[in-house]
Amino acid sequence: MIEINQLQKNFGEKKAVDIEKYSIYQGDMLGLVGNNGAGKTTLFRLILDLLQADLGNVTINDIDVSKNEDWKQFTGAFIDDGFLIDYLTPEEYFYFIGKMYGLKKEEVDERLLPFERFMSNEVLGQKKFIRNFSAGNKQKIGIISAMLHHPQLLILDEPFNFLDPSSQSIIKHLLKKYNEDHH
């Protein structure tokens, strides 16, 4: 469960985030909708402890994200392609992420199987670095890498950005199935 308590973040005079109290429970799927600059990405960065709050805190399963890093073991996230290591191939990157979570190569290969249709023969086996992929395929790599270790908490910022309509439909189905299977 995520608990947000009196969370505030300002950039100069602009208040980007101001949340008195909010809870997100195990199994909830939540989408944030708002105008550009409304603070959605800032909120995600605060939840993931990538930004320091001016006031308040975020806890994940009763762990204050700014004081302890244990929550990272059961959290997957993709905010933008800055999360990717662009001098690796997708395969190398997936194996690297898997290794961070104690997964063997065979386990990573098995966990990639449900994403074959999503990758549509455009990601694996291309023998090129991530930096040379289209924005849509980088988005796919990021989403898959966030889900690879079957996290309890999955945070995806604008997951449909750069994806064609077919890929958007596939990932919506995969996210729904993931939530049903893992919560």
Describe the predicted segments one by one.
Residues 2, 17-19, 72:
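Conserved structural motif at the start of ABC-family nucleotide-binding domains
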Residues 33-35:
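The feature captures the beta-strand-to-loop junction immediately N-terminal to the Walker
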Residues 48:
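Helix-to-loop junction immediately C-terminal to a conserved catalytic motif
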Residues 56-71:
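Conserved ABC transporter NBD signature motif
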Residues 143:
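Hydrophobic anchor residue at the start of the ABC signature
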Residues 148-152:
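A short, proline-enriched helix->beta-strand linker immediately N-terminal to the Walker B motif
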Residues 154-158:
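Catalytic Walker B motif of ABC-type/P-loop ATPase nucleotide-binding domains
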